[in-house]
Regions:
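Conserved acyl-donor/pantetheine-binding loop and adjacent beta-alpha core of acyl/acetyltransferases
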Residues: 61, 67-76, 113, 118-122, ...
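Residue-level recognition of the GNAT/N-acetyltransferase active site
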Residues: 10, 84, 88, 133
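Conserved beta-strand-loop-alpha-helix junction that forms the acyl-donor binding cleft
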Residues: 114-122, 128-139, 157-161
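Acetyl-CoA-dependent GNAT
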Residues: 11-12, 19-73, 79-80, 84
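Conserved acetyl-CoA-binding loop-helix of GNAT-fold acetyltransferases
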Residues: 83, 89-102, 106, 113, ...
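Short, high-confidence coil segments that cap the C-terminus of an alpha-helix
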Residues: 45, 109, 122-125
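Conserved acetyl-CoA-binding loop of GNAT-fold acetyltransferases
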Residues: 143-153
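A short beta-loop-alpha structural element at the N-terminal edge
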Residues: 3-17
């Protein structure tokens, strides 16, 4: 799709993100997305949208962290990705993912080591993580096609309600 434009997500994209999510999951989660999109300045994250002729057809949200769980590096996380079902399997997700990787390679977090002049050493992301439900084979196939493989960590949970 040659006419797809990838750009940064803005507050004005909230309605489009909510609508795409509703098409995928069958229910509206406006408050959920409002927190993620409108309050991203509280927890900054790279976020992109794909659009055709001004219409948002997909989005991807990530964030950068590090040093958690014994990981000695800057880690890029893919928080979520969504593509309008009408445009799925047309390379939109791959375009969004590829652009997010470029952002991750440029970004990083302040790492513990410092340079000789005492300034924090900033490095780009070296590894990307995401979480996928075992019943989402479509997403697992997508991430596999993007080069992901099973990582060294295991998701644990304890139900409290």
């Amino acid at each position: 799709m040659d006419n797809v434009k990838i750009r940064g997500l803005s507050d004005t994209d909230l309605d489009s993100v909510v609508e795409i999510d509703k098409k995928i999951f069958g229910k509206e989660r406006r408050e959920f997305w409002k927190r993620k999109v409108l309050y991203s300045d509280i927890y900054p994250r790279p976020a992109l949208v794909a659009e055709i002729d001004g219409k948002v057809i997909g989005f991807i949200l990530g964030f950068v962290s590090g040093w958690e769980f014994g990981v000695p590096d800057s880690v890029g996380w893919i928080d979520t990705i969504g593509v309008d079902p009408e445009y799925q399997r047309k390379g939109i997700g791959k375009l969004l993912f590829t652009e997010l990787i470029k952002v991750f390679k440029k970004s990083g977090i302040e790492k513990m080591p410092q340079t000789k002049d005492g300034k924090p050493k900033i490095e780009g992301v070296n590894v990307i993580y995401t979480l996928v439900s075992w019943d989402r084979w479509d997403l697992m196939q997508f991430y596999h096609a993007m080069g992901f493989k099973k990582g060294d960590m295991l998701n644990l949970e304890q139900k409290i309600r």
